[in-house]
Amino acid sequence: MAAAWGRFLSRAWLCRTAWQGCGRNYRAALCAELKRPLVIEEVTPRPVQPHEVRVNVHFCGINFADILACQGQYQERHQLPFTPGMEFSGMVLETGTDVSTVKEGDRVIGLPGFSGMAEECITDHKNLWQIPEKVSLREAAALPVSYGTAIFALEHRACTQPGETVLVTAAAGATGLAVIDVATNILQAKVIAAAGSDEKCQLAMQSGAQSSVNYSRGSLKEAVGKLVGSGGVNVVIDMVGGDIFLEALRSLAYEGRIVVVGFAGGTIASVPANLLLLKNVSAMGLYWGRYRQQNFPVFSRSLSSALQYCQEGRIQPHIGEVFELEEVNDAFLHVTQRKSTGKVLLSLK
């Protein structure tokens, strides 16, 4: 994917064209054609509906789902042209007549689905959460997807207990580092971080992991066994899939739990049911965004918890890189080439 994206990456694609209309225009990144670089265009604002809020966006998080959507490979398809961007932070500019949850000037995080990679975003008021006083807009933008997922995986799905050992793969990514942060500082669990390079393992250790494994050097199961013995780990949070998932599954202790969060390695493994039976282990999935429709109170609580933990200074999101809006294609390439660690943000100001 990185090579295909890179072939088309050219500053020539970063253009601005003024849309006809009145009022103050704003800039937005548009996916006008699948598998092509985004373009930056000037957009004429539309009126807010009674249930909607207009937000002055300061930062927008970049997620792999944004890139997949622009490649036409995401499970949710969008009509072209569209603006990617699943999460943002900013300040309320205007509210619809039926909105009472936020007011002009409030600092908020937003989960609009898409449309966040723009200087302004109009979204339903239910997609916004107020940012506590001690949390910066920059920090807040790094929280929703990564920490919402981490909290849900560890607390709601795996039911992680204090003192348990958690193995997390892709540990230097935004969600991986969030898992380390929450497991260590909120749940008082011990973390083994697994990543694909010594540099990424070092970052994971600096972020609170008790030990690390570079799985590009050999068997993950054998390396974990040397750290914990034959007993195994209690919880696995896996973002990689493929052979790494299978080795992590075989590293579980009796009644261990493995949570599948993603397939960054590109391969979806089949689960050997006999392994579940022999140790009475549980394998489960987590599509965090689905809870918005299926169980909104629980979904919302994961975001409120992330904001509160950050307000209290108990967690600290790691922001690896910040790009300007005009550099959005460079930011996408940075992620697809696996150069990124922690959260990658776009600055809209």
Swiss-Prot record:
GO MF annotation: an example: oxidoreductase activity
Class of the enzyme per the UniProt entry, highest EC level: oxidoreductase
UniProt-listed Enzyme Commission number(s): 1.-.-.-
Residue list for modification N6-succinyllysine: K200
TM ranges: none
SUPFAM superfamilies xref list: GroES-like (SSF50129), NAD(P)-binding Rossmann-fold domains (SSF51735)
N6-acetyllysine modification, residue list: K35
Superkingdom classification of source: Eukaryota
Alphabetically ordered keywords of this record: Acetylation, Oxidoreductase
Matching CDD domains: QOR1 (cd08241)
UniProt family annotation: Belongs to the zinc-containing alcohol dehydrogenase family. Quinone oxidoreductase subfamily.
Name recorded for this polypeptide: Quinone oxidoreductase-like protein 2
Organism the protein comes from: Bos taurus (Bovine)
